[in-house]
Amino acid sequence: MLASTASPFFHEQRAGRNLRGCDLKVCIVGCGAIGANLAETLARMGLPQMRLIDFDRVEPRNLSTQPFLRSDIGQLKARALARLLYRATQCRAEAIAEKLTSENADKLLAGSDLVVDCLDNSASRLAVQTAVRKLSLPCLHVGFSGDGYGEVIWDERYAVPDDSHIADPCDYPFTRPLMHLLVGVAAETVVRFLLNGERLNWTVTLSDLKILPLPFR
């Protein structure tokens, strides 16, 4: 039987992608351009719970790439995002407004069924990688660079990049299109893992993407 069109997850139920019954806890580390949009996408696809880790606060410049509102400026990102997700879909997100470091990573990530690293610096990414390997947790790394390149890679194949000479990704002029493309790929990858344990790795380069028009008849 098809799902009722009254359901807020009608499309996901038809596609076999509904996550409402999923009892696995996804932990998203970093609630910036990638993490905040990925959390919103997963919540709108039906994920009923997640953990959000970020110590930063919403700034005016975040509004162009992140799902926050003007009224959220000055608020802690993790808490503002948790409220947004609950209002939108009743997703219950545990907000942890702490900076993840090598000293507290084990404690913050423990109890997760999947860790998604959406951080923007190598030191924190390394702390996540060290912790998930110690705790034997599956981990997906998602990120992009200032030259229009992005990747969605499982930890087994991931090498933490040296960001000492890398430009701020948000300085890339097409940050929002690339970010949304990358979030879509990451969301599909997370869902495939949650539903059947599949692990796929991807690289995304916006300049190589081909969108071809259909021929007129």
State where each predicted segment sits.
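A short helix->loop->beta-strand "cap" motif at the edges of active sites that frequently abuts
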Residues: 48, 91, 135-137
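S-adenosyl-L-methionine
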Residues: 88-103
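E1/E1-like adenylate-forming module used to activate ubiquitin-like modifiers
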Residues: 100, 108-185, 189-195, 212-216
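Core catalytic loop region at the nicotinamide-binding pocket of NAD(P)H-dependent oxidoreductases
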Residues: 196-208
